[in-house]
Design a protein with these regions (language model features):
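Terminal-region recognition feature
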Residues: 1-179, 183-192, 196-216, 221-281
Length: 281
C-alpha cells in the first residue's frame, strides 16, 4: 500500500511539469509560426517587389534586442465572405515597443504579407492599443505603413476601425510625437491617419498615398496616371506638401527616422534634447 501511494504521488507530481512543458513547447511553436507572417511565398513576393517585410523593418529601425512585441497571437476573424479558413497569428500588423538611440518608442508595422496589410477590426484594435500605450507612457508612436486599405470583407466593421484610429490621432496630437513612414501603398482609408500625424516619411518608388488608385481615376476621368505620379514620394514632397521627408531606400529612410527621434522631446512635458557642441557663429 505504501509503495502504491508513493507511485501515485510521484506520477501526480510529474503531471503538472509535463503540462507546463507542453504549454512551453506550444508557445515556442506558435511564436515561430507568428514570425512567418503570411508564409514563405508571400515573403518572397514582398522581396521581389523590392520591399522588406514588417519584421525586417523593425529590426533595422529599433535598437538591437530592445523590441518587445505585443498581441502576437491575435488572429483574423472569419466572416461570411471568406471561406478559406486561413488564420494568421498576429493578424496584418505587428505592434510593440522598443528603443531608438536609447529612447523609448511605440510602433506598429503593417504586414503586407498578411492579406495585403488590410485593416480589419482586430488590426485596428491592435493599433489603437499601442497608441494608447504610447500616450500612457508619454513616448513617440511610429507607424510603418504598407496597406491596401480596408478589408472590405468585414464591411462597416473595418471602416469603424479607421474612425477609432483617427480619434486616437487627434487626441495624441500635441501630446506625443506621431510619425508615419510610407513603405508601400497607403490607399483609401489608410491615407487619412498618416496625414493626421506630425511627420511623414516616404520611400521613392515603393511608397504611395492616394484616396483612389490609377484604375479608378481612369474609369472616372479617363486620365491615365501611374501610381508614382498620383501619390508617390516626389508628388507629395513637391506638389501636395503632405510628405516632409523622402528617401531613396528603406535603410536610408530608417536612418532619417532615427535621426529625427534624436531631436524630438518624448512628449509635451519633456524638453528637447540639448546639443553639447558649441558652434562658432
Amino acid at each position: 500500500m505504501k509503495l502504491l501511494f508513493q507511485t501515485i504521488l510521484r506520477i501526480s507530481n510529474q503531471l503538472p511539469k509535463r503540462k507546463t512543458q507542453q504549454k512551453i513547447s506550444l508557445l515556442k511553436q506558435k511564436s515561430i509560426e507568428a514570425k512567418l507572417s503570411g508564409g514563405e511565398a508571400k515573403i518572397k513576393s514582398q522581396h521581389e517587389r523590392g520591399k522588406l517585410t514588417a519584421r525586417e523593418r523593425i529590426e533595422i529601425l529599433i535598437d538591437p534586442g530592445t523590441f518587445e512585441e505585443t498581441d502576437r497571437f491575435i488572429v483574423n476573424q472569419p466572416n461570411e465572405f471568406d471561406d478559406s479558413g486561413e488564420k494568421f497569428l498576429g493578424e496584418a500588423v505587428i505592434t510593440g515597443y522598443g528603443k531608438i538611440n536609447n529612447k523609448t518608442v511605440f510602433l506598429y508595422a503593417q504586414d503586407f504579407t498578411v492579406l495585403g496589410g488590410s485593416l480589419s477590426q482586430a488590426v485596428a484594435n491592435k493599433i489603437c492599443k499601442i497608441m494608447d500605450l504610447a500616450m500612457q507612457n508619454g513616448a513617440p508612436v511610429i507607424g510603418l505603413i504598407d496597406s491596401g486599405g480596408a478589408r472590405i470583407q468585414e464591411g462597416v466593421n473595418s471602416l469603424a476601425g479607421y474612425s477609432s484610429i483617427f480619434l486616437k490621432n487627434t487626441r495624441a496630437s500635441g501630446v506625443i510625437p506621431q510619425i508615419s513612414v510610407i513603405l508601400g501603398p497607403a490607399a483609401g482609408g489608410a491615407t487619412y491617419s498618416p496625414a493626421l500625424t506630425d511627420f511623414i516619411f516616404m520611400v521613392s518608388n515603393i511608397g504611395q498615398m492616394y484616396i483612389t488608385g490609377p484604375e479608378v481615376i481612369k474609369a472616372v476621368t479617363g486620365e491615365k496616371v501611374s501610381h508614382e505620379e498620383l501619390g508617390g514620394a516626389d508628388t507629395h514632397a513637391s506638389k501636395s506638401g503632405v510628405a516632409h521627408f523622402t528617401a531613396e531606400s528603406e535603410a536610408d529612410c530608417f536612418n532619417q527616422v532615427r535621426k529625427l527621434i534624436e531631436f524630438l522631446p518624448q512628449n509635451n512635458l519633456d524638453e528637447p534634447s540639448q546639443e553639447n557642441e558649441h558652434f562658432d557663429p
